[in-house]
């Protein structure tokens, strides 16, 4: 069954029931409806040594579509363009372009020696979007994101160029991935001030093992209309249960980074092993697999619009698609939160009891109807931010 029947008259209640097993959120303040689980395509192709072959990629695509998924994440970089090409072919073969929501990204350079074939300048963005459209076999991209901050290009140039792409009809919505919060804030302010297409999405790493975005990006997203798309919700497979502190052999691609000095791949830490241990206990009590519990936790955190699934086998994607079929009870969620919590960095560590007591004069301040920021409470001479 496809997402939509070619003949509307043939679209029965059974079809609707099947589709509605997946729920959808609007992406940020946009009107774009996306499934809460997105299909990542970085694993489409074996060019990088650990992905899925074409038949497996197609099977994962089909399973995702049959479950009601409509959101596909890709990038020009992924497997040297194979991911975009295969995704475009799979969508076309099933006639799903009108219902599929395609997100792609630019920034990375695939032309050694050509400095303008990468980065976030206007020249590269214009080049990259045309190349992606050609590989995808479509005339528009639903969501086009800056892949990573290049530390050089002004936000004004990026947002003006992305707005031009929207006005040209090549792009519907725009987003940012892997940027500093201050840069995202400036980009959104520029869009609002100048009437450009606003940032509808932030694509960021988030998991029980990586919670840094909670201090700035989550508040930014919820207050300024940018839905968060989560990548690496299983911490590169660490939270799947396949890795242990001491193990023989190669359990997965993360093993290749055991001795890496790159902070993004330093997953084998004492803190993370403690998280894995607690996750395993909670999953056992729920009668669920560790990946499903880890995905459920991420998907139900504040500000999260969608979670990107990155699988290499059909069995993995089928298991992942069941991640939202249950709820994590408050007590078990508290245990996961406690095991994975990290000390607040400055200045958030400064906004504590003594400071708030001086700010509020010992009163309870900020209590508003549901939907507003949590109130700042003062109890006696101490103060804190309500968790309600």
Feature locations, PLM:
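N-terminal binding-site loop/beta-alpha segment at the start of enzyme catalytic domains
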Residues: 6-7, 11-100, 167, 379-388
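Terminal-tail/helix-coil boundary detector
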Residues: 17, 22, 247-281, 285, ...
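Conserved, mostly hydrophobic/aromatic
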Residues: 27, 39, 57, 72, ...
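Structural preference for beta-strand elements that scaffold enzyme active sites
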Residues: 34-38, 70-71, 99-103, 140-143, ...
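Glycine/proline-rich, positively charged
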Residues: 48, 66, 111-212, 216, ...
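Generic structural signal for well-ordered alpha-helices
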Residues: 61, 84, 88, 129-133, ...
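Glycine-rich beta-alpha junction loops
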Residues: 106-108, 180, 205-210, 232-240, ...
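Aromatic-lined glycan-binding groove of carbohydrate-active enzymes
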Residues: 213-254, 289
